[in-house]
Amino acid sequence: MHCITRGALAYGRGERGWATVGRIICISNQKGGVGKTTTAINLAASLASAERRTLLVDMDPQGNAGSGLGIKQDNITGTIYEALLNDRPIQELLHPTELRYLQVVPATPDLTGAEVELVNQDNREFRLRDALRPLAAEYDYIIIDCPPSLGLLTLNALAAADSVLIPLQCEYYALEGLSQLTHTIDLVKQGLNPDLKMEGILLTMFDSRANIAHQVVEEVRGYFKKQVFEVIVPRNVRLSECPSFGKPIILYDIKSKGCESYLALGRELMKRDTPKSPRRRVA
């Protein structure tokens, strides 16, 4: 626990009390294997280690965000499915984690059926937004882990979010599907959520030995400019190991390169949120 305190101190706590309505950030990329869930877990853990009240909502039927934080299937008392389809208050679905300031709303494979079941629901694209509304003042950050698709579950996340963070692996097919995702974001802004913003693109799985990785970084930074986060997440063995132990990297190996990168991402994100920043109003 002492090492987490030191990690949190590295951020600097700044002014407390100004973030009365937390920001909702969804982590999305319809292409699988880009580090989406890894980013959701470890960004949430990094923010929590800085004593930011953080909620991680798992909208991926694979349920890896919950299991990656040590939530065992046998111990799950409620999932996001129940909030979306059964109108169960989301306050009843919160699960604690090893980090004091981090809670999670888990998912199970039952969520797969929600794509079909939501079709006939009233306000089907706004079910998550309405479920999260009572929690708006309880958290500094709500992180949503989206499924690797652009169906109704992802649309719910985009409609509920203030911004989208897109993980992008530093590999040959990195930009494949990115244009489709940005097009979907534009459509959501036109209809479901006019205030939705691009939080940024996070370059992941960077291998400094591979020329193609450097080329991807150059190409993405050249095209998206300031929309790309400064930090780059490297390929890291410890980062790939920690989910099997049910721990975020900050609890598994705080000295690893993977941990350093996600702590840096948390710092970079929090620098954008100053007391002068306009806060979202609760409708």
UniProtKB/Swiss-Prot annotation:
UniProt GO cellular component terms: cytoplasm
Deleted gene: phenotype: Essential, it cannot be deleted.
GO molecular function: ATP binding; DNA binding
Annotated localization: Cytoplasm
CDD domains (UniProt xref): ParAB_family
GO terms for biological process, alphabetical: chromosome segregation
Keyword Nucleotide-binding: yes
Entry keyword set: ATP-binding, Chromosome partition, Cytoplasm, DNA-binding, Nucleotide-binding
UniProt feature coiled coil, ranges: none
InterPro entries referenced in this protein's UniProt entry, alphabetically: AAA_dom, DNA_Partitioning_ATPase, P-loop_NTPase
Matching PANTHER family: P-LOOP CONTAINING NUCLEOSIDE TRIPHOSPHATE HYDROLASE, PARA FAMILY PROTEIN CT_582
Reported function: An essential component of the chromosome segregation machinery. The ParABS system segregates newly replicated chromosomes during bacterial cell division. After DNA replication the ParB-parS partition complexes interact with ParA ATPase, promoting the movement of the origin region towards opposite cell poles. Segregation may be driven by rachet-like mechanism where ParB follows a retracting polar gradient of nucleoid-associated ParA.
Sequence similarity: Belongs to the ParA family.
Subunit structure: Monomeric ParA interacts with PadC; PadC recruits ParA to the bactofilin scaffold. Probably cycles between a monomer and dimer; ATP-binding promotes homodimers which bind DNA, ATP hydrolysis causes dimer and DNA dissociation.
Protein name per UniProt: Chromosome partitioning protein ParA
Gene name for this UniProt entry: parA
